[in-house]
């Protein structure tokens, strides 16, 4: 495919929980700043095409069908996994759509994940807990080692949350790669979080004023803090130009990026939450 992943900037998002919320919020912010944004996430909730979006719009059914049919003879001898095939499709689609930047969510782990072929502008590791232990290891330190594989030479990395077991792993890998590292847990951007009239929270922040957060769930405060630390880095890199796009992005994640199933109210009588 001619290395399509080299034709656009990327932000790589790893971690056990919060990847989807952080990825969609970052995409909403980048779109609000006027960029053409690719978004690659998994798994999908209803439709496979949710995984691959440009400015919130899902890849077309025709593109998916044509991609598989056109390249079937190439793929069949290789026996790629479902996720490897999907990743190749996403990167090719983003390149053809000429996106400015793509937010790329890791599928599993990090070090050996096929998305780790990218050389991102920024890496984010949301948190570490026990998941996929048969593949990633049976201790938090082992799991952190796999996820720390997304830390690249001289590439800034944001760590959302850490434990006494995982922090040394991240510090060691960042030092090895000469990568600037920020621990969002210690560098609080969120000062207060107050439930708002919607499903989400209004945040008083250290550097970005008052933000109306759309996403619900008590855990979104931690996700928001991670995203804001990432935004501060992206501002310093000139990728995000101002604070206004951050306000717009936080307030319009679902409409802008199509995010579903994050403490989403889908019925009121009776109340049904997805």
What are these regions (language model features)?
Residues 7, 96, 101-106, 114-124, ...:
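Nucleotide phosphate-binding/pyrophosphate-handling subdomain across enzymes
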Residues 160-161, 173-195, 214-218, 247-255, ...:
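Beta-strand->loop->alpha-helix junctions that form or flank phosphate-binding loops
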Residues 1-45, 122-124:
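Walker A (P-loop) phosphate-binding motif
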Residues 144-153:
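Membrane-proximal helix-turn-helix segments that form the acceptor-binding/catalytic region
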Residues 3-6, 32-118, 134-136, 165:
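ATP-dependent carboxylate-amine ligase catalytic core
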Residues 152-161:
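Short loop-to-beta-strand entry elements in the cores of soluble alpha/beta enzymes
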Residues 35, 155, 177-181:
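Short glycine/serine/threonine/alanine-rich loop segments
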Residues 43, 86-135, 167-210, 259:
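Extended acidic/charged loop-beta regions that coordinate divalent cations
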């Amino acid at each position: 495919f001619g290395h399509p992943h080299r034709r656009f900037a990327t932000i790589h998002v790893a971690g056990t929980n919060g990847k989807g919320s952080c990825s969609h919020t970052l995409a909403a912010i980048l779109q609000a700043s006027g960029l053409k944004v690719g978004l690659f996430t998994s798994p999908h909730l209803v439709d496979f095409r949710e995984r691959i979006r440009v400015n919130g719009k899902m890849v077309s059914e025709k593109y998916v069908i044509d991609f598989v049919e056109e390249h079937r003879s190439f793929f069949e001898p290789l026996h790629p996994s479902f996720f490897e095939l999907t990743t190749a499709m996403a990167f090719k689609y983003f390149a053809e759509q000429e996106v400015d930047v793509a937010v790329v969510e890791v599928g599993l782990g990090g070090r050996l994940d096929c998305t780790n072929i990218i050389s991102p502008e920024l890496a984010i590791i949301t948190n570490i807990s026990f998941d996929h232990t048969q593949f990633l290891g049976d201790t938090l330190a082992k799991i952190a080692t796999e996820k720390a594989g997304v830390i690249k030479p001289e590439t800034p990395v944001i760590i959302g949350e850490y434990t006494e077991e995982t922090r040394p792993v991240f510090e060691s890998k960042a030092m090895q790669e000469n990568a600037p590292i920020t621990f969002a847990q210690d560098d609080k951007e969120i000062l207060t979080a107050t439930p708002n009239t919607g499903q989400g929270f209004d945040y008083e922040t250290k550097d970005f004023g008052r933000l109306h957060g759309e996403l619900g769930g008590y855990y979104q405060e931690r996700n928001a803090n991670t995203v804001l630390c990432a935004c501060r880095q992206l501002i310093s890199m000139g990728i995000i130009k101002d604070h206004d796009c951050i306000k717009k992005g936080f307030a319009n994640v679902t409409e802008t990026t199509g995010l579903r199933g994050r403490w989403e109210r889908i019925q009121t009588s009776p109340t049904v939450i997805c």
